[in-house]
Amino acid sequence: VSRRIRIGVGPVDGRSPRYGIDQLDTVLDGMWWGDNVLWVVDDGLSSVDVVLAGVIALADGRDVSDRGFSRGAFDLRDHASIGAVADTACTVVREGKTALWICPRSSVPPALRELAQVIVDQNSTHLRVERADGRRSQVVGTEMPYAVDDGIATVGPPSTVSRLGAGLRSIRKQRGWSQADVGAMIGVSGSAISQTERGTQSLSLDTAVELAERLGVSIDHLVHGADRSYELSRPASFGRGPSRLAPSSPQHFRIVAFATMSLSSSSTGSVSICIGSGVVKLEMADDSIVLGPGDVVRTTGSELRACRNLSAHPALIFQVNEHS
């Protein structure tokens, strides 16, 4: 796969698309319509096709756009191909498709990393979830070991170490603390907390208990992490639950191509952001999410920061303040 990127488009007949990897499907709640999944692999890694055999087999031959492909390759040495990657990824979001992009680590297009709602990193021994828009916050950082034997891949359950790291990361980010802040609570360095969050180093049981006490949470809460600061709904036509705005008069904004608009709200209650058209990234205090037409995010006014148009077309968004 060196210096090339491949795309597979999942089934579009109403079935819920899956990775075909039980552990990953459980962690990520399968694939979601409208998602670009970026699968980053070590250059020359041969096991990627075995691990992804299930989802590759599901690519059903339907076109993701008028480019006329459902499985294809882009040469990342070609600037025109890189532009086509971004255009196609935007089409996936706009039209409620599901796309899996397999890309060598040394050649990940920045635009695709920006647009991907899910990012999975695969090395020779582990799968690691790097991004997971809309899923539980503790999913990010989850690692699963895998092995390939006689052409068959076996993926193990998430490691306890990675679950603890992911949970700690979500609590820390929700509270706006640095890794050094957390380390100071239990007398370790910020670097040690960083290694814990990445799953490369485990805290002892005594230290984990002390940390939970300092944070004012249970060990179970520490492992499972904090909830997301937002709720996401998508159109029923994408195979998910219905979306609706609160019964209020929304403000509407038009964002020109590739522009960023500052967002804020004085609302003392919840705020709903609905995407009328376009592909945008909603920036919040400690999180962000890529959104397409019909997507609705419910959060609080204090969380909102900005909305960035990721495509070459204008975006229309609506903001509804739900006063308490």
Role assignments for model-derived ranges:
Residues 16-63:
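Glycine-rich P-loop/Walker A and Walker A-like loops and their local beta1-loop-alpha1 context
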Residues 66-114:
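P-loop NTPase motor core
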Residues 103-151:
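Phosphate-binding/switch region of NTP-binding enzymes
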Residues 166-185:
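Short basic helix-loop element that most often maps to the first helix and adjoining turn
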Residues 205-257, 263:
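A short, N-terminal "cap"/entry segment at the start of jelly-roll beta-barrel domains
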Residues 268-285:
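Glycine- and acidic-residue-biased ligand/ion/polar-headgroup-sensing regions
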Residues 285-305:
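Short acidic-glycine-tyrosine-enriched beta hairpin
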Residues 301-324:
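Ligand-binding loop in jelly-roll beta-barrel domains
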